[in-house]
């Protein structure tokens, strides 16, 4: 389990997070959403230990992320949006170099995924398109046998068939021990894949809830007139899509783009209906926190 407690983080004097708390249990594919610049990538880097909190803790099964112990590192993989790849290397050489650090790497899985994604494992990266390179890295990431997989904009550069393949592969490969976090602004690409959903904004967590809980609290009405009580309305073919508080308990089809806009425009209402996590009292900094604070200044 990934646990984030009382997390503060800033780049010099620019605050990114202020006392946020999140828990990512295993067995789920989480959607991490937010406008550009709110800290989605920063949060992924904090989770895998590439950044240190100013205050608070980030742990994976009790191991402190920024300590980057080998026991933790072999259980987590982070795929950034862009990766600098050696022109003359190949996907097979790439995983050969990673193999010693990941004892659960499965060569057969890698080759199967490369075949499914229609990329040749021995083709040089310089001969590939950006999308082919991205598919190679996705195949590699899912072959390392880690419990935790962090994706930053994984569908960037993928064509429509490849996006469908990505969704299919991820849904099939999710196991009870896995936690997958997808940070993206292309929500349509992962709309039927992610559950729960986390939305970040202005140093805080605006929403942290399962799809079922969102549907209990909000109703998505399709094809009607624009409603004055709507948290968000959007004209679509056949009428308006309205997002309104769910007063009847009736279930509706979630639209993540509409949800995102409704949350950003109605922060207080989203908090009142119980979709925003309650902030916990900030604990006094420990000696480790103070040392971390110094290293970030």
Task: Give residue spans per PLM region.
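The feature captures the beta-strand-to-loop junction immediately N-terminal to the Walker
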Residues: 33-35
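ABC transporter nucleotide-binding domain
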Residues: 165-244
């Amino acid at each position: 389990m990934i646990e984030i407690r009382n997390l503060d983080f800033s780049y010099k004097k620019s605050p990114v997070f202020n006392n946020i708390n999140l828990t990512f249990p295993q067995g789920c594919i989480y959607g991490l959403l937010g406008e550009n610049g709110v800290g989605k990538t920063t949060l992924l880097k904090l989770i895998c230990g590439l950044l240190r909190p100013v205050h608070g803790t980030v742990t994976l099964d009790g191991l402190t992320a920024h300590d980057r112990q080998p026991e933790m590192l072999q259980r987590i993989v982070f795929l950034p949006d862009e990766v600098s790849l050696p022109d003359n290397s190949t996907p097979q050489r790439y995983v050969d170099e990673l193999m010693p650090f990941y004892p659960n790497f499965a060569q057969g899985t890698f080759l199967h995924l490369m075949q499914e994604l229609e990329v040749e494992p021995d083709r040089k990266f310089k001969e590939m398109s950006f999308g082919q390179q991205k598919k190679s890295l996705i195949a590699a990431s899912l072959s390392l046998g880690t419990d935790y997989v962090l994706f930053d904009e994984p569908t960037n550069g993928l064509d429509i068939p490849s996006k469908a393949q990505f969704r299919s592969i991820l849904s099939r490969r999710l196991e009870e021990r896995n936690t997958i976090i997808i940070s993206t602004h292309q929500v349509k690409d992962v709309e039927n894949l992610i559950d729960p959903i986390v939305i970040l904004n202005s140093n805080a967590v605006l929403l942290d809830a399962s799809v079922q809980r969102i549907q209990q609290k909000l109703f998505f009405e399709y094809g009607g007139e624009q409603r004055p009580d709507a948290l968000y309305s959007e004209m679509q073919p056949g009428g308006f899509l309205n997002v309104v508080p769910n007063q009847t308990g009736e279930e509706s089809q979630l639209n993540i783009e509409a949800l995102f806009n409704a949350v950003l425009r109605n922060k207080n209402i989203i908090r009142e209906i119980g979709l925003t996590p309650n902030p916990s009292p900030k604990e006094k900094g420990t000696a480790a926190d103070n040392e971390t604070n110094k290293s970030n200044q």
